């Protein structure tokens, strides 16, 4: 017989906290009509795990791909699909710290870039641009579409939005498509954008993992270090907004894709990578957590 799960102190809507990087940040998760909308309940939960208070705005086309109840459950609040007497797109009484448009469709991107505000979503984003212009909020968009729609019109619209202070999150490009990035990647971009940490923008070098020394063409001396500590340090710095570079000794653990990293397969490679980084003079600080070989 399958046993029942152990009891939990969490309610059905609660999430297990991963960090406080988005603590006390009000985030408008703006869901437009791309197929990637089906992933947004998990995205909302991820943002909440980092401390965000998330309100979902969904277009009618988005609700073809994701259920309104699923978004309401994942955000633990009602989904806004229409504008009423409260003028939800203005959010004057309780303004948002950031607007994350994910997925951002071709149609939505081009409408917002040209100032069209003829739907609840585009009206919300017109207001968001006004708040960005006043340095009151941040606007991030994650473009998703088939590669054939990635044309000059789209490029010019994205450049226009960037010139207005919008952060364009690079898509995960696979199989001829601009795909929505992984949830942790989106959470990282959001955290870095809203961060007020003194580490924001600082260049920091981190090392981690083993540095094997070859005995011959087959055997080598190494240790049990995995590099988890170095990855954890680099990830924390990344979420705080630092420009972090990680040199990771080859092990069974791979750093997340959003971290700028190099893999060192030997002590000699590690030494060369570290010295090259330090000689560049671009780093404000360095944290050395690698298990450097001491048996040469």
Named regions from a protein language model:
Residues 1-296:
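A cross-family phosphate/adenosyl-ligand binding-site feature
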């Amino acid at each position: 017989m399958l046993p029942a799960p152990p009891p939990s102190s969490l309610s059905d809507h609660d999430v297990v906290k991963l960090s406080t990087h988005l603590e006390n940040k009000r985030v408008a998760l703006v869901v437009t009509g791309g197929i990637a909308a089906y992933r947004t309940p998990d995205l909302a939960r991820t943002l909440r795990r980092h401390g965000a208070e998330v309100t979902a705005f969904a277009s009618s086309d988005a609700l073809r791909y994701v259920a309104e109840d699923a978004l309401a459950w994942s955000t633990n609040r009602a989904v806004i699909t229409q504008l009423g007497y409260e003028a939800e797109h203005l959010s004057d009484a309780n303004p948002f710290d950031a607007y994350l448009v994910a997925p951002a469709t071709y149609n939505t991107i081009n409408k917002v870039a040209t100032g069209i505000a003829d739907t609840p979503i585009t009206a919300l984003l017109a207001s968001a641009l006004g708040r960005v212009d006043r340095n009151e909020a941040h606007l991030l968009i994650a473009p998703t579409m088939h590669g054939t729609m990635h044309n000059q019109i789209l490029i010019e619209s994205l450049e226009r939005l960037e010139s207005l202070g919008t952060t364009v999150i690079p898509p995960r490009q696979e199989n001829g498509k601009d795909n929505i990035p992984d949830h942790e990647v989106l959470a990282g971009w959001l955290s870095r954008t809203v961060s007020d940490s003194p580490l924001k923008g600082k260049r920091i070098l981190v090392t981690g993992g083993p540095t094997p020394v070859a005995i011959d063409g087959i055997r080598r001396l190494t240790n049990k270090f995995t590099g988890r500590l170095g990855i954890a340090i680099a990830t924390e710095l990344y979420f705080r907004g630092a420009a972090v570079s990680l040199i990771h000794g080859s092990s069974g653990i791979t750093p997340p894709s959003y971290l700028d990293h190099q893999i060192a397969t030997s002590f000699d490679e590690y030494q060369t990578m570290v010295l090259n980084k330090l000689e560049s003079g671009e780093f404000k600080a360095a944290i050395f957590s690698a298990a450097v070989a001491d048996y040469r």
